[in-house]
Regions:
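Solvent-exposed, low-complexity, repeat-rich "mucin-like" stalks and linkers
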Residues: 18-42
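A eukaryote-biased signal for short, well-structured alpha-helical docking elements
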Residues: 70, 74-108, 226-264
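Short aromatic-acidic-glycine turn motif
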Residues: 79-85, 140, 150-167
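Short, solvent-exposed loop/turn segments enriched in Ser/Thr/Gly
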Residues: 51-56, 124-131, 199-203, 280-286
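Intrinsically disordered, low-complexity Pro/Gly/Ser/Thr-rich segments with frequent PxxP/GP/PP motifs
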Residues: 162-198
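Terminal connector regions
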Residues: 197-233
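Serine/threonine-rich, repeat-prone extracellular segments and beta-strand-based repeat modules
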Residues: 37-62, 66
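Asparagine-centered strand-capping/turn motif at beta-strand->loop junctions
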Residues: 120-128, 133-152, 209, 289-291
Length: 291
């Protein structure tokens, strides 16, 4: 992996519709781009093909109603989940995609949320669509909190990773996210990104189940008009389990002396057998005590 990247997607249709579409949002401050993204998703899930205009940020405890293409949407503030994210998923093996294929298929439950880091490049001669979806194989409704951001498609694979990370960190620091309801047997598409040849997409996604049993996370790439790849063609990247994906580091600096701070430690085993150095997808907080 060349960058601290991020991204995702997968195909789905779903008979999922609210009588009055409602967008449930969490966060001390929900950035304008995420308000727009969450509202756009709810419209799509309700079968409404229209673009949501640029939005104002959503302040703490603030709700409002949007009128988009003749449809009223209610933005409702809700509390963020108590569950922790303890599983790190890396979708970067393969990094280069040349045809329709599955990239990640993973089941998770209430015992630990997931953080997906993804970074992929279209090396085919035509267009490719990258999809991310959540599906509920159970017999009861599943409620899932998601917080995700992406960047691209662009040609600069270093730049796209940094932009995606910056956008996601704005959500992370504010606990900004969207609470979604997945009916039994239902699927919801979270993201679809269309890449031209040589373009790259990158992104991060956190998902925590607040109610229900296991939920499936899928990432796949398809050529326009082609069916979703069979499950047996998926090649998962590595999955790491931690007590926490947040690390606190405290060090003391004494005037007149030098101090070295290191970021990332440990050697992870990538799915292709190669070693990667560093702690991709983890948050490090440094406290420097001056004496």
């Amino acid at each position: 992996m060349r960058v601290a990247a991020i991204f995702t997607a997968c195909v789905l249709g779903l008979a999922w519709a609210q009588v009055t579409p409602e967008v449930w949002l969490t966060g001390s401050l929900v950035p304008p781009s995420f308000v727009q993204q969450a509202a756009q998703r709810v419209l799509y899930w309700n079968g409404i093909q229209t673009n949501v205009p640029v939005q104002e940020p959503l302040e703490p405890g603030q709700g409002r109603t949007l009128s988009v293409g003749g449809t009223d949407l209610t933005l409702t503030p809700v509390a963020p989940p108590n569950g922790r994210v303890t599983q790190l998923l890396l979708s970067n093996d393969p990094e280069n995609i040349s045809a329709t294929r599955g990239l990640f298929h993973y089941s998770f439950g209430q015992d630990g949320g997931v953080r997906l880091v993804y970074h992929h490049k279209n090396t085919s001669a035509g267009m490719l669509e990258l999809h991310i979806r959540l599906s509920n194989p159970g017999s009861l409704d599943a409620w899932v909190w998601v917080s995700d951001a992406n960047a691209g498609p662009v040609a600069d694979e270093i730049f796209v990773g940094h932009v995606a990370t910056k956008r996601w960190l704005e959500l992370y620091w504010n606990r900004a996210g969207q609470l979604i309801q997945i009916p039994p047997g239902g699927q919801l598409e979270l993201t679809k990104l269309t890449m031209r040849p040589a373009q790259v997409v990158s992104g991060l996604l956190e998902a925590v189940i607040t109610q229900g049993q296991n939920v499936l996370l899928d990432v796949c790439a398809t050529a326009p008009g082609e069916d979703e790849p069979p499950l047996e063609t998926y090649s998962n990247g590595p999955v790491y389990r931690f007590g926490s994906l947040e690390t606190q580091v405290s060090q003391t600096y004494r005037a007149g002396r030098s101090l070295q701070l290191s970021l990332g430690e440990g050697t992870f085993q990538a799915g292709n057998g190669k070693k990667i150095r560093g702690s991709w997808g983890q948050i490090y907080t440094y406290t420097l005590n001056l004496t």
